[in-house]
Structures are given as structure tokens and as C-alpha cells.
């Protein structure tokens, strides 16, 4: 098994979103990390089977695990760039995400002009990545939500929930863009 795959399966401390869990410095020893990783695996009910590297999408996700949350956020910002501009949030994006939103990859969701918040964008990023990951193993699907901070109840309109035909290309391009600039 590849080292990058092992850390996804057995070392959630190394990649879990810091708002879900942050390891205190006093517990940063190898023994403590091992125990806390076991607790996290149990607490979240994470399976410990094998990642199916013969599944090209699963292999792709494993290879780019470190940038998935950032790439998903970039994809959501790209898709809803019109709403971001309308609400004056475009220039509050980090430079990398702002630059990615300027690429002409997909059309913007111009049908939505309501209030869009950072929490809403995080939820949309999560949805982009879960849609992209629809045909991967349960082991991967269980771990993807942990890349994001715990999702609050978000009052979303139906315009956000529509399935996107261009999700595959948008997320792949965002991953490549994030990886190149990581």
C-alpha cells in the first residue's frame, strides 16, 4: 500500500479540518497520535479497508488528497462567481481562488443572485466534491466530509441543489490549478 494512501486511511489527524479536531502540542508524540487516530476512526465510524486504486477517480482523489478541500472551494467560487460579484465578495477571495474564478471553464450560475455567505460557499464546496466523488468507495466517501469544517444547517434554495453536468471538468481543473499553485 502506498504511503499517501495509508495516511488517508489510518492518520486522519494529518488531514482532518482543524475546526473538527486540532491536536494539542502536548499530545503530538507518536504514541499519542496513534491513540488519537484510533479514537477519531472510532468516533466517526471510519472503515479501514483498502482504497481501490484501480478505480481511476479514487486513485486521482488519493493522489490529490492534500488539495481537495481548497480545490472544491475554488470550484464552488467559480460556479457562483456571478453571485460573489453581485454580493461584493469577489475581491475578498484569496488571490489563487480569485484568479481561478476568472478562467472561462463553465458558465456562472447567473440564475442565483441572492445572499451568498462564506458558510454557504463552504457548503457548496462540499457538495461539489461529493458530487464529483459519487462513484468512489465508501471508505473515501466517509472521509471527504472530514476535509471540511462541520457543516452548519444552511438554508439553501433549490437553485443551489441542482445537479451539475459540468462538475467533472470543473473539479478536475480546480484540483490541477490548486496542485500547481500549492
Residue ranges and their predicted role:
Residues 1-182:
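General marker for long, soluble alpha-helical cores
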Amino acid at each position: 500500500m502506498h504511503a499517501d494512501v495509508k495516511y488517508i486511511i489510518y492518520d486522519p489527524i494529518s488531514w482532518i479540518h482543524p475546526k473538527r479536531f486540532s491536536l494539542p502540542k502536548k499530545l503530538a508524540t507518536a504514541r499519542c497520535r496513534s491513540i488519537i487516530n484510533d479514537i477519531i476512526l472510532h468516533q466517526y465510524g471510519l472503515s479501514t479497508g483498502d482504497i481501490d486504486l484501480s478505480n481511476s477517480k479514487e486513485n486521482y482523489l488519493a493522489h490529490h488528497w492534500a488539495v481537495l478541500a481548497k480545490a472544491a472551494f475554488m470550484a464552488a467560487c467559480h460556479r457562483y462567481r456571478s453571485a460573489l460579484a453581485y454580493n461584493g465578495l469577489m475581491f475578498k477571495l484569496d488571490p489563487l481562488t480569485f484568479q481561478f474564478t476568472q478562467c472561462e471553464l463553465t458558465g456562472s450560475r447567473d440564475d442565483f443572485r441572492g445572499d451568498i455567505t462564506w458558510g454557504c460557499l463552504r457548503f457548496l464546496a462540499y457538495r461539489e466534491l461529493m458530487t464529483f466523488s459519487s462513484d468512489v468507495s465508501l471508505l473515501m466517501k466517509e472521509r471527504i466530509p472530514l476535509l471540511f469544517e462541520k457543516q452548519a444547517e444552511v438554508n439553501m434554495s433549490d437553485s443551489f441543489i441542482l445537479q451539475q453536468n459540468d462538475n467533472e471538468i470543473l473539479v478536475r481543473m480546480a484540483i490541477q490549478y490548486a496542485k500547481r499553485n500549492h
